[in-house]
Every structure is written in structure tokens, then in C-alpha cells.
């Protein structure tokens, strides 16, 4: 009951309204003050609030109904639960505040008294969904809760970081290295007839620091934070000004390793544990949170159910391509009756010091978890199979749903997510959540539970079992479309339009190094000057990650007249793990849509270029927490114009993960291009600024009104499918080993970070 109150009452965070259009503009003082509050209220959110201004403000909580635009039964129940102490310690939710002052006071109160996890969850929903918060942002979730993204070894080192102790340690370490590294290669040479230095490449690639002679501890960063666009920032005088006097420290951080048991899946941990990938899934489930009803928050206008299920398919396709890179092939089939050969230990630790549960090798799905949830989930899938097979469903209220209409996939998507828009809550509500609770071995009556990665959106994608289970979820989508007729040749044909050629530039992936701001893990004393917080120390997690070089498409399209069109681009495999060509009928499930854009064709031959950095659903690295806070403070002093588009929208997929790893000699893949008339009844992104906002609930955040994944949404009849306005292009994806220079000879500056790594 307690959890039900919490989940339903969190809806009170946000007020329903449409999203109005905002020009990209410079923030005014009022906006900056709000942004400063949001940044400070989540600083070290697991520690007591240290900002005196917000402590004073948070001493009271507004329970007066007149202070809210909406006050329902769940808010009443929450208030009663709060009075009797029947809520999670330190945090549940805050209400529909009529104005910023009431909201701010309630947020400060919640920050001091309520559970920090629920507090951040609720605050995130408010910032995303309230129209009066347009442009306001929170730090990325991996900056608020770094312990959900980095292993326990790193977290412990960050939590106990002390500058004074570090200063003494680094002095002793220098004396040690001056002796050890004088002739490192000679020291190891000919021992057991091996020259160990030349075997540094035997380390997993993502243990890059060993090749530079670094250890897993803190190093002073005297130059700059590492990221793709660091050269641009290094030339910005304002950027250099805000970091003057700031001490930065980095520590190498690994992905999960094979420690106690063999797990071949760990070779993919650089992908499954990628910070950007897990952040994307987290925000997708914040944008379309299952507890928010579509009518109130406009989510139905975005086709929330279909879009959520489409994203599941996209992620599965991307994961499958990464598996092919390593020769693994199909994602294993999931069944509650099966034994999963390879276990998983996330090596994560909760902020209270309790480690996350792990899954052993030969995990018997049926033998773990609460059996009441097991039967609920099994019943859920059986019921779904029944109604899809029948093609019609009569709800508890007597409403008839025709499941042979393609647009009914919206209902199926809502059922699979278990959101409150499910067309029959009596039978289907929260079954998806129950499955995760079964995997996490918890139930709604537990007051204390062990942390488990399946209980957090930001952690669940780390486990390979996630993809197995979600493949089962996606199978419902394909089962639904088994009963929908394939597109005919006439439906796919765009008369008068022919794709003559598409030239693709070289596709190259590589591993780069990046710094993540993890200052929220620090426990040292905060610095205040005249009551104002001074961010004088920053901790950085330095990690290797997959990236790709920019690439582009050169289109050559012939048109009989001027047409406004939508051009879709998909990436998919060519061969399976055994080198066999995958038929298009089977392969349609494996194609990932990487771009869609509107273009006006002129009569005749159209020759134009599309750059990978312009893909509409991808984003580059977001500006870090530290940087954003310093920019805000500089703007409040009148020394900087703070643009609302200073950071990337939270809802984008990481641009650097568009391409799979590939092979050194080239991995065969294929692009698919398809042109269709633009027929949408709206202008995409027309009611909001997509440079910094996501337009959740606007109804105009998608390119057009065609089904997601079109034309691969339905089964394919290869006799009907091929038309002149589509084009397949065979390509190869090459992987460049950026660590190759460390293999052949000794790194001259061994024991120090190599800043020439990027050159």
C-alpha cells in the first residue's frame, strides 16, 4: 500500500499543460536563480544539506490545499502517511505547487527529510514535465548518483578522497617511481624467457592505464577534462576563467571483470555498462514514466506505448550488432523455465555501503524471487498471447479493442510497459514492474530490500539478462504484426522518386578516453566564502569508451518534380555469426533506425550530403555538472551570457554509439535508405526548441506520423517489398586500435598520463 501511495502521488509533481515555443535565448537573473537552486539542491544529495539558504527555506512544508493547482486523494494519503511516519526516510514527493516559491520550499524540505532516491526521481519528473520549467536542467543522473555507474572500488576511493592525504601520498609515490621506472623494461626482461612489457596488449583494452604505467588511484589533472570537444573549450577564455583555482583529480576506472567465475559476456561490458547508454534508458523511462497518465501530461500525443516498445527494439538491434562484432550471434532466448549459463556481478555498491546482489552462473530463473510475482508475470504473457491470437479484446468495462488494426500497437506498447494508460488496468497494470521485482527478489510489502540492478532504470541494462528478457517483450511486438498484412508494392512505392546512389564515407570506430564528473561522491569539507559555495575541487572518473569518427552520406536522388519527403536511414547486419547471409524477412528485426529527416527534392537530379553529427535523435556529450554550475555563477555576476542551449537535450541517444565496434579488417554491414512522402499534419519540433528541449507531450517531437521503424514494422513479402525509392548499401566498419602505439615499444613517460593519446 505504501508503494502504491508513493507511485501514484508522485504524479502530483507536474502540472498538465502544453509546451510553448521558446526561442534559444540568454537566461535572465530569475532563470539563473532557479537554475542555481536546482544545481545546489542535488549537490551531494546523499549527505545532509549544507546550503544555509536552502536549510532555512526547507524548515516548512506546504500542506495547505490552496497552495496547489491539484490536490487529490493520493496527496491526502501521503499527508496522512507523513504524519504517522509511514513513508520512506528522507523522501517521497512534492505537490502541484502553484508558484516557484511554494515548489522551492517543498523541494528544500523534501531534500532534508525524504529518501534521496525518491527525491531525485520526483524532482527529475518535475523538471522534465512542467511547462514552466522550460530550459531548466538537472545534472545528468550519472553525476547525481555516480555509484550507479561505476564499480565499488572506484566509489570507495572517491568517498574517502582527502586532498591533504593525497598530497602527501603523491609525494611519496614520486620518489618510488623515480626508482622503479628508471629502466622498467630491463627489470622485466628475460624473466622466465618472457619480455612482459610487450605483453601489455594482453590486458583487456579498457584497462588502458596499465599501458601508461598508472594505477587505480587519484592523479592531479593540471590541464583539462577529457572529451570529444575539449579543444573548443580550451580556446574559450570564459571557460578557462571559471576553472581558474579549481583543483581537478582523475582516477582510471574499469568496467566489470571476471573475478570469481567465468563469464564470456564480460567482453561486452564496455557497451552494456556504457554511461551514455544507461543514461539514455533512464531518461526514456522518465520522459514516459509509467505512473504518468497520457491524457494529463500529453504523452498520448507522442504515441507513448508504441514509442517505448520501438525503443526496446532499437536497443536490442544495437546490442545484437555489438554481439556480432565478437562472434556471439543471437541474443539467447529467455524463459522462466530456463537456466542462464553465465551469471553477472555488477560490482556496484549502494550509498549506504551495501553491495548490489549478483547472479551466479547457471542461474535458474524459476528458483529465485517471489513466486506470487512469478505467477502474475506468467499469467500476463499467457493472457497477452491469448488476446493477440484472438485479435480482439473486451475490457473489464465492456469496451472492444480491435487488435488487427496496425495502430493498436499503441495499446500493446502500453501493456508491455505497464503504464497507467493500459486499456484494462484491472488485468494488466504493473505486470512489467512485477517482472523486475521478481528478478530483484522483492515485493511491495518489503520495508528493507537489497540493492539489485533490475530495480533501477539506470542500472538494469548492465546485465546481459536484461536483453534476454526484453527480447521476450519485443517478441510480443512481432507476434502482433504476424497478423497484420505486409506492405504491398503500391504502398511502398513513391512514384517519380528513385535513389540512384548513396556514397558512404569510411566508417571507423575506436576507443577514446573521457572524464565523468563524480564530485557528488566526495565527503570532504565544502568551501563557503561569504555564504557562497565555492566549487574548488572536482573528481573525475576517467574511462575508456566506444566512439566513431564522423562520417557522411552523399545522396544522389532523381525526382520527376518537387517533393517534400522524409528520408529514413537504417543500419543492420549482413551476415550472422557463422558468416551466412541473413534473409531480409528475418533481418528486419535487426535493423536499427539511425536517422530520419525532411528534405525538399527538386525536379531532376538531387545531390546532397548528410553528416552523422546531424542525425536527429543523437546527441554529443552533455556539459558537465561542474561546468554548468560555474557558468551559472559567472552569469549571476554579470560576466557571462548563459544560453539555454548550453547543454544537449537529455533525451538523445549517444552519437558515438551509432556504429558497432567493427573489425580491424572491416566488418560487413549494410545501410538501408527509404524515401516516403512527407504527410504529417504538423511541423516537427514546431512548438519547442529542440536544441535544448525534448518536447515531451507536445505531439510534434517525431518526424512524421508513420509507424516507428517504418517500413520494417511489418513482416516483409520480398516479392512486393523492393521499390526504386529504397536503397541498400553494403559497407564495412573498421576498428582502429588507438592503443597500438603502446604495444611495440616502451612508453617513454611511463607512470604519467599520455596527453598525446588523441594525436
Curated annotation (Swiss-Prot):
Cellular compartments annotated: Secreted, Extracellular space
Signal peptide: 1-16
GO cellular component: extracellular region
Segments forming a coiled coil: none
Domain of life of the organism encoding this protein: Eukaryota
Keywords recorded for this protein, A-Z: Secreted, Signal, Storage protein
MF terms (GO), sorted A to Z: nutrient reservoir activity
Role of this protein: Arylphorin is a larval storage protein (LSP) which may serve as a storage protein used primarily as a source of aromatic amino acids for protein synthesis during metamorphosis. It is a constituent of the sclerotizing system of the cuticle, and serves as a carrier for ecdysteroid hormone.
Family membership: Belongs to the hemocyanin family.
Name this protein carries in UniProt: Arylphorin subunit A4
Amino acid at each position: 500500500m505504501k508503494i502504491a501511495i508513493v507511485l501514484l502521488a508522485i504524479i502530483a509533481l507536474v502540472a498538465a499543460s502544453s509546451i510553448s515555443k521558446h526561442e534559444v535565448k540568454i537566461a535572465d537573473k530569475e532563470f539563473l536563480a532557479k537554475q542555481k537552486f536546482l544545481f545546489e539542491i542535488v549537490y551531494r544529495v546523499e549527505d545532509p544539506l549544507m546550503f544555509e539558504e536552502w536549510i532555512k527555506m526547507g524548515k516548512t512544508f506546504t500542506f495547505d490545499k490552496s497552495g496547489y493547482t491539484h490536490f487529490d486523494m493520493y496527496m491526502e494519503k501521503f499527508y496522512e502517511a507523513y504524519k504517522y511516519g509511514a513513508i520512506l526516510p528522507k523522501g517521497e514527493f512534492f505537490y502541484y505547487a502553484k508558484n516557484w516559491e511554494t515548489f522551492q520550499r517543498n523541494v528544500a524540505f523534501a531534500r532534508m527529510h525524504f529518501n534521496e532516491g525518491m527525491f531525485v526521481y520526483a524532482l527529475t519528473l518535475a523538471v522534465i514535465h512542467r511547462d514552466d520549467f522550460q530550459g531548466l536542467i538537472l545534472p545528468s543522473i550519472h553525476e547525481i548518483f555516480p555509484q550507479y555507474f561505476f564499480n565499488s572500488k572506484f566509489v570507495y576511493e572517491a568517498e574517502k578522497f582527502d586532498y591533504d592525504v593525497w598530497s602527501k601520498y603523491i609525494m611519496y609515490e614520486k620518489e618510488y617511481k623515480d626508482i622503479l621506472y628508471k629502466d622498467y623494461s630491463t627489470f622485466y626482461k628475460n624473466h622466465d624467457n618472457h619480455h612482459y612489457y610487450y605483453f601489455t596488449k594482453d590486458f583487456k583494452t579498457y584497462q588502458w592505464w596499465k599501458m601508461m604505467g598508472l594505477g587505480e588511484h587519484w592523479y592531479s589533472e593540471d590541464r583539462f577534462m577529457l572529451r570529444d570537444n575539449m579543444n573548443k573549450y580550451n580556446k574559450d577564455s570564459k571557460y578557462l576563467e571559471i576553472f581558474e583555482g579549481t583543483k581537478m583529480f582523475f582516477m582510471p576506472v574499469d568496467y566489470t571483470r571476471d573475478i570469481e567465475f567465468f563469464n564470456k559476456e564480460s567482453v561486452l561490458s564496455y557497451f552494456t555498462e556504457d554511461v551514455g547508454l544507461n543514461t539514455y534508458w533512464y531518461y526514456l523511462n522518465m520522459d514516459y514514466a509509467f505512473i504518468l497518465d497520457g491524457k494529463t501530461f500529453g504523452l498520448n500525443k507522442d504515441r507513448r506505448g508504441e514509442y517505448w516498445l520501438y525503443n526496446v527494439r532499437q536497443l536490442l538491434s544495437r546490442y545484437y550488432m555489438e554481439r556480432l562484432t565478437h562472434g556471439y550471434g543471437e541474443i539467447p532466448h529467455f524463459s522462466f523455465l530456463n537456466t542462464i549459463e553465465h551469471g553477472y556481478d555488477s560490482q556496484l555498491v549502494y550509498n549506504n555501503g551495501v553491495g548490489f546482489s549478483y547472479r551466479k552462473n547457471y542461474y535458474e530463473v524459476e528458483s529465485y524471487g517471489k513466486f506470487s510475482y512469478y505467477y502474475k508475470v506468467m499469467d500476463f504473457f499467457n493472457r497477452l498471447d491469448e488476446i493477440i491470437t484472438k485479435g480482439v479484446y473486451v475490457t473489464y468495462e465492456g469496451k472492444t479493442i480491435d487488435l488487427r488494426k496496425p495502430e493498436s500497437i499503441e495499446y500493446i506498447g502500453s501493456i508491455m510497459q505497464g503504464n497507467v494508460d493500459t486499456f484494462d488496468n484491472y488485468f494488466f497494470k504493473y505486470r512489467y514492474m512485477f517482472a523486475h521485482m521478481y528478478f530483484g527478489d522483492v515485493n511491495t510489502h518489503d520495508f528493507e530490500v537489497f540493492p539489485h540492478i533490475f530495480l533501477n532504470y539506470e542500472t538494469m541494462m548492465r546485465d546481459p539478462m536484461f536483453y534476454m528478457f526484453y527480447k521476450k517483450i519485443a517478441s510480443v511486438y512481432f507476434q502482433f504484426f504476424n497478423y497484420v498484412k505486409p506492405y504491398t508494392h503500391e504502398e511502398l512505392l513513391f512514384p517519380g522518386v528513385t535513389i540512384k546512389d548513396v556514397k558512404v564515407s569510411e566508417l571507423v570506430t575506436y576507443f577514446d578516453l573521457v572524464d565523468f564528473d563524480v564530485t557528488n561522491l566526495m565527503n570532504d569539507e565544502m568551501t563557503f566564502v561569504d555564504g557562497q559555495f565555492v566549487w574548488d575541487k572536482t573528481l573525475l572518473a576517467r574511462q575508456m569508451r566506444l566512439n566513431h569518427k564522423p562520417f557522411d552520406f552523399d545522396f544522389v536522388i532523381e525526382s520527376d518534380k518537387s517533393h517534400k519527403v522524409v528520408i529514413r536511414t537504417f543500419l543492420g547486419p549482413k551476415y550472422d555469426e557463422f558468416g551466412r547471409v541473413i534473409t531480409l524477412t528475418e533481418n528486419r528485426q535487426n535493423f536499427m533506425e539511425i536517422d530520419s529527416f525532411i528534405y525538399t527534392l527538386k525536379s531532376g537530379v538531387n545531390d546532397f550530403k548528410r553528416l552523422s553529427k546531424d542525425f536527429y535523435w543523437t546527441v554529443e556529450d552533455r556539459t558537465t555538472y561542474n561546468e554548468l554550475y560555474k557558468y551559472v555563477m559567472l552569469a549571476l555576476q554579470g560576466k557571462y551570457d548563459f544560453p539555454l542551449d548550453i547543454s544537449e537535450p537529455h533525451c538523445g541517444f549517444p552519437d558515438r554509439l551509432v556504429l558497432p565496434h567493427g573489425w580491424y579488417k572491416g566488418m560487413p554491414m549494410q545501410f538501408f535508405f527509404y524515401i516516403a512522402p512527407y504527410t504529417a499534419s504538423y511541423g516537427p519540433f514546431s512548438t519547442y526548441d529542440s536544441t535544448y528541449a525534448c518536447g515531451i507531450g507536445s505531439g510534434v517531437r517525431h518526424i512524421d506520423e508513420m509507424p516507428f521503424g517504418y517500413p520494417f514494422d511489418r513482416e516483409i513479402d520480398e516479392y512486393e517489398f523492393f521499390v526504386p525509392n529504397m536503397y541498400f548499401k553494403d559497407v564495412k566498419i573498421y576498428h582502429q586500435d588507438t592503443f597500438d602505439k603502446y604495444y611495440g615499444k616502451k612508453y617513454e613517460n611511463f607512470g604519467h598520463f599520455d596527453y598525446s593519446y588523441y594525436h
